[in-house]
Amino acid sequence: MAVPKGSLWLRAQLGIPPLLLLAMALAGGSGTASAEAFDSVLGDTASCHRACQLTYPLHTYPKEEELYACQRGCRLFSICQFVDDGIDLNRTKLECESACTEAYSQSDEQYACHLGCQNQLPYAELRQEQLMSLMPKMHLLFPLTLVRSFWSDMVDSAQSFITSSWTFYLQADDGKIVIFQSKPEIQYAPQLEQEPTNLKDSSLSKMSYLQMRSSQAHRNYLEDGESDGFLRCLSLNSGWILTVTLVLSVMVLLWICCATVATAVEQYVPSEKLSIYGDLEFMNEQKLNRYPASSLVVVRSKAEDHEEAGPLPAKVNLAHSEI
């Protein structure tokens, strides 16, 4: 069963402050084993313990209670820092001093415990700075370097794809097309042969032999370079050619889009606004003259009062009208 995190649950269940409970656990059990077990989690307090030993040496303070109280203050500060996740060290120090006040009733032991809390504070700040320095930080130029690496990878892959194979199309006399495809073959200049190991040869013969081989290698290299100079230049500069082609393609596409938008017919037809003064505005636009009020003739008719419809015709029985 997992124990809930937080000091409120411990106070409610046990009625003992959690920091005091942890300090009692560290002091009551095997001191060395428990300290080694918690050092990896709570941090190293050896420097604080040495400071306490220098402050309370046994030859000056025969009683060991004050020394133990100071060392326990170091441990209490580490526990408080672990509980608070090291957010505010000043608050951690206040909690450590409060735990010392609850743990000890003697003023000397309380002072020694408070001194242990104070001694552990600079070491905790140093450890926190070291942890912050270990955190990875992103440089401002990291996006640019990422884009550059992506672009270089894309260019290299395209270059390797282009130079992966050579394809030749030949048309025979009967009209058939023959396709030759093969991987590019790299020709290296022939290496100079090793000098003869015969000790009887003179140095002059060695020099003439080397000059002859070097001139032959240079001549072969020039002949090969003249034969496939264009293809070699294309393969070496394919990266720049591909880059320029892509940039020009993007520029052409942008120009086409802008030209299309500029010359396109407007598809949006603005809706006409309705107004209660539409007739008046129409007359003003057409410059029509209004009729004066005196030229209007109003004709009124008198309605007859109490005018009723005539009586209905009498009903005739058709059976009595037979002849």
UniProtKB/Swiss-Prot annotation:
Post-translational modification summary for this protein: N-glycosylated.
GO biological-process terms attached to the record: autophagy; positive regulation of autophagy
Topology feature Cytoplasmic, residues: 260-323
Motif position, ATG16L1-binding motif: 263-281
Subcellular location per the Swiss-Prot or TrEMBL entry: Late endosome membrane; Lysosome membrane; Cell membrane; Golgi apparatus membrane
Pfam families per record: BSMAP
Transmembrane segments: 239-259
Extracellular topological domain: 36-238
Cell wall biogenesis/degradation recorded as keyword: no
Domain of life from the UniProt record: Eukaryota
Keywords: Autophagy, Cell membrane, Endosome, Glycoprotein, Golgi apparatus, Lysosome, Membrane, Signal, Transmembrane, Transmembrane helix
Domain comment as written in the entry: The ATG16L1-binding motif mediates interaction with ATG16L1 and promotes autophagy.
Family stated for the protein in its record: Belongs to the TMEM59 family.
Record note on quaternary structure: Interacts with ATG16L1 (via WD repeats).
Function: Acts as a regulator of autophagy in response to S.aureus infection by promoting activation of LC3 (MAP1LC3A, MAP1LC3B or MAP1LC3C). Acts by interacting with ATG16L1, leading to promote a functional complex between LC3 and ATG16L1 and promoting LC3 lipidation and subsequent activation of autophagy. Modulates the O-glycosylation and complex N-glycosylation steps occurring during the Golgi maturation of several proteins such as APP, BACE1, SEAP or PRNP. Inhibits APP transport to the cell surface and further shedding.
Protein name per UniProt: Transmembrane protein 59
Organism: Bos taurus (Bovine)
Lineage of the organism: Eukaryota, Metazoa, Chordata, Craniata, Vertebrata
Gene for this chain: TMEM59
